[in-house]
Swiss-Prot record:
It comes from the Eukaryota. It comes from Homo sapiens. It is linked to Meier-Gorlin syndrome 8: A form of Meier-Gorlin syndrome, a syndrome characterized by bilateral microtia, aplasia/hypoplasia of the patellae, and severe intrauterine and postnatal growth retardation with short stature and poor weight gain. Additional clinical findings include anomalies of cranial sutures, microcephaly, apparently low-set and simple ears, microstomia, full lips, highly arched or cleft palate, micrognathia, genitourinary tract anomalies, and various skeletal anomalies. Its EC number is 3.6.4.12. This is DNA replication licensing factor MCM5. Acts as a component of the MCM2-7 complex (MCM complex) which is the replicative helicase essential for 'once per cell cycle' DNA replication initiation and elongation in eukaryotic cells. Core component of CDC45-MCM-GINS (CMG) helicase, the molecular machine that unwinds template DNA during replication, and around which the replisome is built. ADP binds at R371. Early fractionation of eukaryotic MCM proteins yielded a variety of dimeric, trimeric and tetrameric complexes with unclear biological significance. The MCM2-7 hexamer is the proposed physiological active complex. Gene3D superfamilies: 2.20.28.10, mini-chromosome maintenance (MCM) complex, chain A, domain 1 (3.30.1640.10), Nucleic acid-binding proteins (2.40.50.140), P-loop containing nucleotide triphosphate hydrolases (3.40.50.300).
Length: 734
């Protein structure tokens, strides 16, 4: 019975005296009557529409459904009686009990007569809700102890639901004296059993010390659960670790959230005894130290993970402004210019990132399956092309954004980890980056530096948007409805035009999950270099003086709200004409990719599959969502196809020999291909031949010598042949 009779935990109200316990019963009765009047008489409505008794009707409806709880809004209580609301804010532990007793009495009145078998009146749980501005975990100090607080955050761990006694019965082992119906304080509060038996011992031997034990079958218990709340990522100061807070939920508040949920908590800021620093407790170091937790009285959950908390704060004036913005004929260009305006160029990439931020429409099919609406994007190419800067901007711009680096991210850190709870010694689950970013964007930098095992772990999260865990006896599925924006470098550091697909070191399984793949090259163009240098110098010179945004751009805060508003309010679908057009174009794309593979005599590392068809649908829906339109038009499909063409399709069709220096024409590429085929026919795998004789034979066939050297160089880099005997002989490996 160690869970019931642990004497090492103290409740916050018992810390510092029994002043509250000495208050008169008359005052409590009066306050309870006032709470009862509030629940019975509070009305909503107008003279024209008629009045309804809000809480009285809610109590009756919930009770008849077998749900013994009611949610009270603090603003309603304040409008009815400010003193009552003030008492509840400053001394919630005492006054919440009076409010629950009042709710039980009102429920008794409104549910009479009850059906046979249900005559026993059930206890009512009161949950609290408030529209007040929330505090942060960092702002909770000792002067707020035992007060009502409102805290936002992310649930990162949840324990199993367990039982806690609210009323216990104890019995003496020696004389069988029984004490029944002993009330327990709520929260993480234990009960210290009496050390001595208080019965009359006349004519009987004295009972020994510590004679009482708990009778579990005569205890009244409720469910309880402990949660771990973490600060929101955008509330953590730079360079600091996010802080955590333990939460205690009971009764109907259990199992309302899972790791990864963004929540706002209403509760009592309480304390419990800090763990002893020595194993046996001989040195009672830290006797006066208490650790804090929150006894939860209400939970508001961002259920769909789409930034609803942001959209809920949109005023009617802002809504009208957003609708005017969406109605602009060039809203697509305005938004794309607002994506990282300090970065020069990359227009198509910025347009693609704008589509990623808005996302497509998530669809639930009749058979229960879902199709993701979030867009995944990969930027692949040279260093110094502002890939990481774009990632940082998207993290700030997205309503929910998590930034991580590939080298410092493990599979468990990205998905979810199972660890042992230090208090209960049970296994609990903590969500990783992709769970915490549910409803937002995960930005993964240095994607190519990740270990292959860790990269495979996010396959399911990217396509099915769930994370399935089967570890340490825990088998569950977490939501990770987020977009992935990844940046990676070429295998050789810089993009080497002579190596074609060898620059890409990713498996087709991961590449097919990206809706758009941009190959970013640092091209040497004098005119572009002049403009780029001018732009960068201007940024550095005017960094201290330029405070206003460039003409025609949307500022970051407004853009962030507009994205959240569109994601919640709009879920467009393809129109019939757009769907027909897309079907025809997809067939042409597939046949073009197949013809390219046949001509180049090798499969592309970037496949064109049905996933890419769905990608174009999502891009078209995102373009429609920017305009708050219910259907994606043919123009949206045309732009989606263009974006797909300049990104993934161009990357997939970049053949092995395309773009080689000095061989840009189709005829030259065909010549190189012919040389390679003849060379492979010339000597089999495992055989060797003199390099000098190879060059001599091909020059006799009127092939240019530099072309023969280029083919040999390409085959050497691909590992198909290797030099032997002081680079005089070529040996074929594959």
């Amino acid at each position: 019975m160690s869970g019931f009779d642990d004497p090492g935990i103290f409740y916050s109200d018992s810390f510092g005296g029994d002043a509250q316990a000495d208050e008169g019963q008359a005052r409590k009765s009066q306050l309870q009557r006032r709470f009862k009047e509030f629940l019975r008489q509070y009305r909503v409505g107008t003279d024209r529409t008629g009045f309804t008794f809000k809480y009285r009707d809610e109590l009756k409806r919930h009770y008849n459904l077998g749900e013994y709880w009611i949610e009270v809004e603090m603003e309603d209580l304040a409008s009815f009686d400010e003193d009552l609301a003030d008492y509840l804010y400053k001394q919630p532990a005492e006054h919440l009990q009076l409010l629950e007793e009042a709710a039980k009495e009102v429920a008794d009145e409104v549910t009479r007569p009850r059906p046979s078998g249900e005559e026993v009146l059930q206890d009512i749980q009161v949950m609290l809700k408030s529209d007040a501005s929330p505090s942060s975990i960092r702002s909770l100090k000792s002067d707020m102890m035992s007060h009502l607080v409102k805290i936002p955050g992310i649930i990162i761990a949840a324990s199993a639901v367990r039982a806690k006694a609210t009323r216990i019965s104890i019995q003496c082992r020696s004389c069988r004296n029984t004490l029944t119906n002993i009330a327990m304080r709520p929260g993480l509060e234990g009960y210290a059993l009496p050390r001595k038996c208080n019965t009359d011992q006349a004519g009987r031997p004295k009972c020994p010390l510590d004679p009482y034990f708990i009778m579990p079958d005569k205890c009244k218990c409720v469910d309880f659960q402990t949660l771990k709340l973490q600060e929101l990522p955008d509330a953590v100061p730079h360079g600091e670790m996010p802080r955590h807070m333990q939460l205690y939920c009971d009764r109907y508040l259990c199992d309302k959230v899972v790791p990864g949920n963004r929540v706002t908590i209403m509760g009592i800021y309480s304390i419990k005894k800090f763990g002893l620093t020595t194993s046996r407790g001989r040195d009672r170091v830290g006797v006066g130290i208490r650790s804090s937790y929150i006894r939860v009285l209400g939970i508001q959950v961002d259920t769909d993970g789409s930034g609803r908390s942001f959209a809920g704060a949109v005023s009617p004036q802002e809504e009208e402004e957003f609708r005017r913005l969406a109605a602009l004929p060039n809203v697509y260009e305005v938004i794309s210019k607002s994506i990282a305006p300090s970065i020069f160029g990359g227009t198509d990439m910025k347009k693609a990132i704008a589509c990623l931020l808005f996302g497509g429409s998530r669809k639930r099919l009749p058979d229960g399956l879902t199709r993701r609406g979030d867009i995944n994007l990969l930027m692949l190419g040279d260093p110094g092309t502002a890939k990481s800067q774009l990632l940082k901007f998207v993290e700030k711009c997205s309503p929910i954004g998590v930034y991580t680096s590939g080298k410092g991210s493990s599979a468990a850190g990205l998905t979810a980890s199972v660890m042992r709870d230090p208090s209960s010694r049970n296994f609990i689950m903590e969500g990783g980056a992709m769970v915490l970013a549910d409803g937002g964007v995960v930005c993964i930098d240095e994607f190519d530096k990740m270990r292959e095992d860790d990269r495979v772990a996010i396959h399911e999260a990217m396509e099915q948007q769930t994370i399935s865990i089967a570890k340490a006896g825990i088998t569950t599925t977490l939501n990770s409805r987020c977009s992935v924006l990844a940046a990676a470098n070429s295998v050789f550091g810089r993009w080497d035009e002579t190596k074609g697909e060898d620059n890409i070191d990713f498996m087709p399984t991961i590449l097919s999950r990206f809706d758009m793949i941009f190959i970013v090259k640092d091209e040497h163009n004098e005119e572009r270099d002049v403009m780029l240098a001018k732009h960068v110098i201007t940024l550095h010179v005017s960094a201290l003086t330029q405070t206003q945004a460039v003409e025609g751009e949307i500022d970051l805060a407004k853009l962030k709200k507009f994205i959240a508003y569109c994601r919640v309010k709009c879920g467009p679908r393809l129109s019939a004409e757009a769907a027909e057009k897309l079907k025809n174009r997809y067939i042409i794309m597939r046949s073009g990719a197949r013809q390219h593979e046949r001509d180049s005599d090798r499969r592309s590392s970037i496949p064109i599959t049905v996933r890419q068809l769905e990608a174009i649908v999502r891009i078209a829906e995102a373009l429609s969502k920017m305009k708050l339109q219910p259907f994606a038009t043919e123009a949206d499909v045309e732009e989606a196809l263009r974006l797909f063409q300049v990104s993934t399709l161009d990357a997939a069709l970049s053949g092995t020999l395309s773009g080689v220096e000095g061989f840009t024409s189709q005829e030259d590429q065909e010549m190189l291909s012919r040389i390679e085929k003849q060379l492979k026919r010339r000597f089999a795998i495992g055989s060797q031949v003199s390099e000098h004789s190879i060059i001599k034979d091909f020059t006799k066939q009127k092939y240019p010598e530099h072309a023969i050297h280029k083919v040999l160089q390409l085959m050497l880099r691909r590992g198909e042949i290797q030099h032997r005997m002081q680079r005089k002989v070529l040996y074929r490996l594959k």
